[in-house]
């Protein structure tokens, strides 16, 4: 692979929205400057991939054909002359590459840079044997964690950590806070476990329509589970009628935000992570009079990724991984779209 301009790579290409991804050989450029070429060890499948595949979440700069996949980890095989990493290291790839010039990038908030590059959305991602990373600054080194275990941390883990950091001021208002996690899927795997790892005095209530997913929430560490229709009586019982300190909404529809708002204590908040709906809804009187909040939470910081990697390496976060060969990626998309996945599917080239 030394001194070549292109590297052949088998990859899953999105050529037409909502049609099966095409498995083809593509050319990946040799890294230059700060760039790094990694051999993908694992690439997680996220609901965002589904939305991009369906054509409902196209970022500025999106072009077809494209290799999807923004939850990526692997091994460094080639580096540009300015890259500050070395070959052979296992790494996980941060998934929003800021332009490094805006006021938010100067604060390290690359996740809200309007000119961000996102692998799998505005540049080729990791559903491939090899992936070119724009700069070594977007890599977090793995010590004991395998790339397959680390891949979902690039988004699901980092997004969960980012949401929890936003929730901390509200959780700390109460001596025995009750935290709602709404929507038990790939994100909840990490949200529930991180909450348990960081805070010992909280009570977690997992909400899902599916009994299977409610049982899964208990396995992850939730203290109680409920359907939304029964949640009010449970929350009132747990808090003597006060309400929950925080609700982390991993679904994000008008119905979920409205119902969760009614479950909050005064000065409680919803951290909105999911984007399954087009709008959110809260009761104006209830929200204004009781000082309730709705906060958006998009992804997380490089430090969030670093922290969730170290929590995983210390054994405080257990991976729930379903390995899927690259050739079966379309089956993985179907399974996720039809709600048949507990944990995180990880594509292995």
UniProtKB/Swiss-Prot annotation:
Family per record: Belongs to the zinc-containing alcohol dehydrogenase family.
Description of how the protein assembles with itself and partners: Homotetramer. Dimer of dimers.
Cofactor info, note text: Binds 2 Zn(2+) ions per subunit.
Functional summary from the UniProt entry: Participates in a pentose oxidation pathway that converts D-arabinose to 2-oxoglutarate. Catalyzes the NADP-dependent conversion of D-arabinose to D-arabinono-1,4-lactone. In vitro, can also use L-fucose, L-galactose and D-ribose. Shows highest activity with L-fucose, in combinaison with NAD, and lower activity toward L-galactose and D-ribose. When acting on its physiological substrate, D-arabinose, shows a clear preference for NADP over NAD.
SUPFAM superfamilies referenced in this protein's UniProt entry, alphabetically: GroES-like, NAD(P)-binding Rossmann-fold domains
GO biological process: arabinose catabolic process; protein tetramerization
Comment block on domains: Contains two domains: a catalytic domain (residues 1-154 and 292-344) and a nucleotide binding domain (residues 155-291). The active site resides in a deep cleft between the domains.
InterPro entries according to UniProt: ADH-like_C, ADH-like_N, ADH_Zn_CS, GroES-like_sf, NAD(P)-bd_dom_sf, Zn_alcohol_dh
Gene source species: Saccharolobus solfataricus (strain ATCC 35092 / DSM 1617 / JCM 11322 / P2) (Sulfolobus solfataricus)
Induction of expression: Expression is highly induced during growth on D-arabinose. The promoter contains the conserved cis-regulatory element 5'-AACATGTT-3' ARA-box found in arabinose-induced genes.
GO molecular function: adenyl nucleotide binding; alcohol dehydrogenase (NAD+) activity; anion binding; D-arabinose 1-dehydrogenase (NADP+) activity; zinc ion binding
The keyword Zinc belongs to this UniProt entry's keyword annotation: yes
Gene3D superfamilies: Medium-chain alcohol dehydrogenases, catalytic domain (3.90.180.10), NAD(P)-binding Rossmann-like Domain (3.40.50.720)
Protein name: D-arabinose 1-dehydrogenase (NADP(+))
Top-tier EC class: oxidoreductase
Binding site for Zn(2+) 2: 99, 102, 105, 113
Binding of Zn(2+) 1, residues: 46, 70, 155
Key words, A-Z: Arabinose catabolism, Carbohydrate metabolism, Metal-binding, NADP, Oxidoreductase, Zinc
Record note on pH: Optimum pH is 8.2. Is more than 50% active in a relatively narrow pH range from 7.3 to 9.3.
Requisite cofactors: Zn(2+)
Temperature dependence as stated in the record: Optimum temperature is 91 degrees Celsius.
EC number(s) per entry: 1.1.1.427
């Amino acid at each position: 692979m030394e001194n070549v301009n292109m590297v052949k790579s088998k990859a899953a290409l999105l050529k037409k929205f909502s049609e099966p991804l095409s498995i083809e050989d593509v050319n990946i450029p040799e890294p230059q400057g700060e760039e790094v070429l990694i051999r993908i060890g694992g690439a997680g499948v996220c609901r965002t991939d589904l939305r991009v595949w369906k054509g409902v979440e196209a970022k500025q700069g999106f072009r077809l054909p494209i290799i999807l996949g923004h939850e990526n980890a692997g091994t460094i095989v080639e580096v540009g002359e300015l890259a500050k990493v070395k070959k052979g290291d296992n790494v996980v790839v941060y998934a929003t590459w800021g332009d490094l010039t805006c006021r938010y990038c100067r604060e390290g908030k690359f996740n809200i840079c309007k000119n961000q590059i996102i692998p799998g959305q505005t540049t080729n991602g990791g559903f491939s044997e090899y992936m070119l990373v724009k700069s070594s600054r977007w890599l977090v080194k793995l010590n004991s964690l395998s790339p397959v275990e680390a891949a979902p941390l690039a988004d699901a883990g980092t997004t969960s950590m980012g949401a929890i950091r936003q929730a901390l001021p509200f959780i700390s208002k109460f001596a025995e806070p009750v935290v709602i996690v709404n929507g038990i899927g790939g994100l909840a795997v990490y949200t529930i476990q991180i909450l348990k790892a960081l805070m010992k005095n909280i009570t977690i209530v997992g909400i899902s329509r599916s009994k299977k997913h409610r049982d899964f929430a208990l396995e992850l560490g939730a203290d109680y589970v409920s359907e939304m229709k029964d949640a009010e009586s449970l929350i009132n019982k747990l808090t003597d009628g006060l309400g929950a300190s925080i609700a982390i909404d991993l679904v994000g529809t008008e119905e979920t935000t409205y119902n969760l708002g009614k479950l909050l204590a005064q000065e409680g908040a919803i951290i909105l992570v999911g984007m399954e709906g087009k709008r959110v809804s809260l009761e104006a009187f209830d929200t204004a009079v009781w000082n309730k909040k709705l906060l958006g939470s998009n992804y997380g910081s490089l430090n969030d990724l670093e922290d969730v990697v170290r929590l995983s390496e210390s054994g405080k976060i257990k991976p729930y991984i379903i390995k899927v060969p690259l050739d079966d990626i379309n089956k993985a998309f179907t399974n996720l779209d039809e709600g048949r996945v507990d944990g995180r599917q990880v594509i292995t080239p």
